[in-house]
Design a protein with these regions (language model features):
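Conserved catalytic submotifs in the C-terminal HATPase_c
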Residues: 12-17, 34-47
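Short beta-strand/loop element within the Bergerat-fold HATPase_c
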Residues: 75-85
Length: 163
């Protein structure tokens, strides 16, 4: 996490077919799904962009894995929407949701909500650090008992790192 925060973790940008990547992530996540939860990949338009494949996969896989942990039954949807200057990825679940008073803290290090995870509470902090290093932002909307939607917005044009 400290390498991410100091921008010393190198990003490797290459042209990437985002639709194909999403299908690969879908196949990988489908193997982790438990009975009673449906996984749906939103039908997205074709998109090729320059991005770091490994980091984008890490971010989306982490968000999807969290959705699985917190959705006992229902559905998990994910996909992306393109705008003129950016692409917004989303992971939506019909799980337990996040209490309103906890929303502002979930991207902090070592934060876990009651009965929320078996991890150490670094996943969302790492996601946020990577997204910011890639020139984007991450946010969440949630309602207890209804689920959550995580949004990751990344620029279509590779960000320039100032030295």
């Amino acid at each position: 996490l400290s390498k991410i925060e100091s921008n010393s973790m190198p990003l490797i940008y290459k042209e990437l077919d985002i639709g194909l990547l999403m299908k690969e992530i879908y196949s990988m996540i489908l193997l982790r799904m438990h009975e009673g939860v449906e996984l749906e990949l939103y039908d997205c338009e074709e998109l090729v962009m320059e991005t770091d494949r490994n980091r984008l996969t890490q971010i989306l896989t982490n968000l999807l894995t969290n959705a699985i942990k917190h959705t006992q039954e229902g559905s998990i949807r994910f996909g992306y929407k393109r705008s003129a200057l950016s692409v917004e990825f989303f992971v939506q679940d019909s799980g337990e949701g996040i209490p309103e008073d906890k929303i502002d803290t979930i991207f902090s290090r070592f934060v876990q909500l009651d009965n929320w995870s078996k991890g150490v509470g670094l996943g969302l902090a790492i996601c946020q650090g990577l997204v910011e290093q890639m020139g984007g932002n991450i946010r969440v909307t949630s309602r207890v008992g209804e689920g959550s939607v995580f949004y990751v917005t990344l620029p279509l044009i590779r960000p320039r790192i100032s030295s």
